[in-house]
């Protein structure tokens, strides 16, 4: 297997296959779940809005893909600073049966100088997840922009109990970048290597995925990269990976994520 194919296979098994669109329907989520059971193996998870968790769970069981985890989003996509709402949404997501919750850090309040609300929101949402769900914190690096802000938001999220830190919602102009990824993984190495990392948005093909995997191995070691500590948030990436692996043609890109 070539290096590119190896990267494609690894990336596929580390993917949170995502649909987070305003026009999502039960049928679109059913189709997404079927894609998660790909000709080259299972994706790590699907990532969907909370109301679709029951239909996703049912579909994954029916197709023999119950090992695919179900991730959802809260405080999404704007990262508001209302802790009560974020916690209520997170509790509801866990009650629906989410295995993982991707919560948006209150990045605008943080950029305005309020570090405490970020810590408190992440801590409260982690408590709401209990032992039932992993908490991934989206810090929205494309809006933070500055290295110092990306570093500090990563530190606060980890200190507050995040299981993963994630670059982006996919809903702003700039999503995952190698520069932001390096900063975030350096913080993970310094603070707690048990915390995972998820680049989201802008990872379009096996070559780009391979660059992120190589960076993760360089910073945190070859044994660190697994579905427990590394995910790709993506939608259009799957078709490209399957094409690289010899399964069908690469269709047109239909999503910015």
UniProtKB/Swiss-Prot annotation:
Gene3D superfamilies: Aldolase class I
Pathway: Carbohydrate degradation; 2-deoxy-D-ribose 1-phosphate degradation; D-glyceraldehyde 3-phosphate and acetaldehyde from 2-deoxy-alpha-D-ribose 1-phosphate: step 2/2
Gene Ontology CC terms, in alphabetical order: cytoplasm
Single Gene Ontology BP annotation: carbohydrate catabolic process
UniProt GO molecular function: deoxyribose-phosphate aldolase activity
Catalytic reaction annotation: 2-deoxy-D-ribose 5-phosphate = D-glyceraldehyde 3-phosphate + acetaldehyde
EC number annotated for this UniProt entry: 4.1.2.4
Active site: 102, 166, 198
SMART domains: DeoC (SM01133)
Subcellular location: Cytoplasm
Signal sequence coordinates: none
CDD domains, sorted: DeoC
Main localization (coarse): cytoplasm
SUPFAM superfamilies according to UniProt: Aldolase (SSF51569)
Superkingdom, taxonomy of origin: Bacteria
Keywords assigned by UniProt, alphabetized: Cytoplasm, Lyase, Schiff base
HAMAP family named in the record: DeoC_type2
Protein role: Catalyzes a reversible aldol reaction between acetaldehyde and D-glyceraldehyde 3-phosphate to generate 2-deoxy-D-ribose 5-phosphate.
PANTHER family: DEOXYRIBOSE-PHOSPHATE ALDOLASE
Family membership: Belongs to the DeoC/FbaB aldolase family. DeoC type 2 subfamily.
Protein name: Deoxyribose-phosphate aldolase
């Amino acid at each position: 297997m070539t290096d590119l194919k190896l990267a494609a296979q690894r990336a596929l098994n580390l993917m949170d296959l995502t649909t987070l669109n305003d026009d999502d329907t039960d049928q679109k989520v059913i189709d997404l779940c079927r894609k998660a059971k790909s000709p080259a193996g299972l994706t790590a998870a699907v990532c969907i809005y909370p109301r679709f968790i029951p239909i996703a769970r049912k579909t994954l069981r029916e197709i023999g893909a119950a090992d695919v985890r179900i991730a959802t989003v809260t405080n999404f996509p704007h990262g508001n600073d209302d802790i009560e709402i974020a916690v209520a949404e997170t509790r509801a997501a866990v009650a629906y049966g989410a295995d993982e919750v991707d919560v948006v850090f209150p990045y605008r309040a943080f950029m305005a100088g309020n570090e405490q609300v970020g810590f408190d929101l992440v801590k409260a949402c982690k408590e709401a997840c209990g032992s039932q769900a992993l908490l991934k914190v989206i810090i929205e690096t494309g809006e933070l922009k500055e290295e110092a802000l990306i570093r500090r938001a990563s530190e606060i999220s980890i200190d507050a109990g995040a299981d993963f830190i994630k670059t982006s919602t996919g809903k702003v102009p700039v999503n995952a970048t190698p520069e932001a990824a390096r900063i975030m993984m350096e913080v993970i190495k310094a603070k707690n290597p048990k915390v995972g990392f998820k680049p989201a948005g802008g990872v379009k093909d096996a070559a780009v995925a391979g660059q992120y995997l190589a960076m993760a191995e360089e910073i945190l070691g070859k044994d660190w990269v697994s579905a427990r500590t590394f995910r790709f948030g993506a939608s259009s990436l799957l078709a490209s990976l399957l094409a690289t692996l010899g399964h069908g043609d690469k269709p047109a890109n239909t999503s910015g994520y």
